[in-house]
Amino acid sequence: MTFENLGGHAQRRDESAYRLGEEDGRQKGESSRKKRPPLSRKNPSNVSFWSNEPIIRHSSVKTDRPQFHRADSTVTEQSSEILFDGNAESAEPLSKRSPPFLAYTPKRAVSATLATTQSSPISTSFNPQLPSNSNTNRFDFGSESQLSSNYTNDTGLSLLSLPKSVPHSPAMHKRTPSSDPNNPFGSTFANKFLDHIPAEPLPLPARPQISDLSFFRKPSLPSALQNIVIEKNASQRSVSEPLHNLSSRYSHFTSPHIDDSQHFPPMEFFARSDELPNPFVPFFDLDSKPNLSTLQDNASLTSQGSNLSSQNSGLSSSSSGIFGRMPIPAQSLDTTMLRTDSNSNIRRATTSFIANSEKENSSNFIDPQKYASIKFKNGNGVSKFMFLFTFGIVFPPLWILASFLPIPRTKIHQMRVKHVHWRIINRVVACLGVAITFLFIGLGVSG
């Protein structure tokens, strides 16, 4: 073996050893990477981050599958089903899942039904309590109603007592209850039951009253007008009509008040009646035109002191009403001012009473011009309030500007923490100064 062969063999051996060592290092690195973290005070559980156990997250954490989260609140009904929002929309028929209304009524309540031989062109949105197929007309039964027409000739059968031997046709079983789990009553459930009800004309719906079978009331209009009225009601009825009746339709006074009654009767209530009271209620009642002697008799009872001096001999005091013990000059008690048929005269009498009493008792009144300005005044006429107000307006903006000025004899690299603290304190106090400014502005506006 030559030296070159020895050298090549050694080189291949070194390469294979290097490759083995590289694989060992890779395996060693993988094994060390898969090891669980050691137990310590900060990590008491040695469950690593790569474990296959699911992470139990809080419910507020957003995930990529929000459909598995629970709802934050219970799903309420639509607002149009409970509250009337004023939108007159066409009423949708009830869903197929809802149980039929006629199947749970007593026998006497079912007396009003359809004639199976005649089909009336009533809109599908007329009666929301009957189950129907939304694709077809609600009362258009077609050939299905004619299949069992021999059972409709006044047999007196009710809904809940049906004959057991009913001839079924394949047309009646378009969709059986067992074939469609979403429609447990079947698409022709109401049609099969309505065929066995004795034929009577469809009633006109009246205003629904509580504990009243007015829905099954006999029609009060001729049959020629029924369809017109029904179509009009169907186009104008709102969605929330079955659950919420508008109280404004059934009240005497349609008003926006919360109890649906006006605080005062309407003005037409007093239109053609002279004996009814005036709708404008005065402050006090004057039964008849008073004469001066009765008022002077009352004045002797209510005047202060038993002896009437010469200064108040011409005055009289009313014993009741809003004027109380206010001294009233006798010459102002004019019969034209105390007439009860006009409120303007009463108002004029009131103003004349007050004006005369102010003239008589002028010494007891305070001159408002004496206290028009603030009492505390300096010699130069500038009040303390104006000084403080001006100080509060001018000083805080200057403080703000001073707080943003650089600190002298300091460079950027020489700034210390105390400088930052002092600048922050400056700005906080400046903001407080702005608040004080607005405080003084409010005081000035209110004062």
UniProtKB/Swiss-Prot annotation:
Low complexity: bias regions = 300-321
Please tell me one Gene Ontology term that the record gives under cellular component.
membrane
Q: How does it sit in the membrane?
A: Multi-pass membrane protein
Q: State where composition is biased (Basic and acidic residues).
A: 11-32, 61-72
* Broad class of the protein's primary localization: membrane
The record's subcellular locations are: Membrane
Where is region (Disordered) located? Answer: 1-80, 115-184, 295-322
**Top-level taxon of origin:** Eukaryota
Composition bias (Polar residues) maps to 42-51, 115-158
Query: Keyword set for this entry?
Result: Membrane, Transmembrane, Transmembrane helix
Can you tell me where the transmembrane regions are?
Answer: 385-405, 424-444
The protein here is known as: Uncharacterized protein C405.02c
